[in-house]
Amino acid sequence: MKHWKRRSSAVFAIVLQVLVLLLPDPAVAMTMEQFLTSLDMIRSGCAPKFKLKTEDLDRLRVGDFNFPPSQDLMCYTKCVSLMAGTVNKKGEFNAPKALAQLPHLVPPEMMEMSRKSVEACRDTHKQFKESCERVYQTAKCFSENADGQFMWP
């Protein structure tokens, strides 16, 4: 478990460093191209840890949660959210932190939809006991409240 934590921390640090390089001026918002690149980087950091089908990951990418998730897929969503710093190890979503990070995580054209989704889904995790399912169901809620604009690593 400690090895996974160290590896996760290292991957997260690399992702943050690349994002800093992509956004040299903190006052400049992330472009859609940079956003898509960051999704790919996060996916490459989390996906190898789980037994996942590329087709399932591609469906999540476009907000399609209309298929039965495997435990690995649900835990993949937790890995992604841990990397983003929006959940804790118990799968509890931190809406204030997510709202504060939105300007650094999404391009301006997705900002309003993202805020709306965070507000609508802030307590979704409380309906579930298992940590991976908590995060998966929160991500699914985001998708359902995103007016067709949702994207996931």
UniProtKB/Swiss-Prot annotation:
GO terms for biological process: courtship behavior; olfactory behavior; response to ethanol; response to pheromone; sensory perception of smell. Butan-1-ol binds at S81, T86. SUPFAM superfamilies: Insect pheromone/odorant-binding proteins. Specifically expressed in chemosensory system in both males and females. Expressed in a subset of trichoid chemosensory sensilla located on the ventral-lateral surface of the third antennal segment. Secreted from non-neuronal support cells into the sensillum lymph that bathes the olfactory neurons within these sensilla. It is found in: Secreted. Disulfide bonds join C46-C79, C75-C132, C121-C141. Its main location: secreted. One of its GO terms (cellular component) is extracellular region. GO terms for molecular function: dibutyl phthalate binding; diphenyl phthalate binding; odorant binding; pheromone binding. Gene3D superfamilies: Pheromone/general odorant binding protein domain (1.10.238.20). Pfam families: PBP_GOBP. SMART domains: PhBP. Belongs to the PBP/GOBP family. This is General odorant-binding protein lush. It comes from Drosophila melanogaster. The lineage of its organism: Eukaryota, Metazoa, Ecdysozoa, Arthropoda, Hexapoda. The gene is lush.
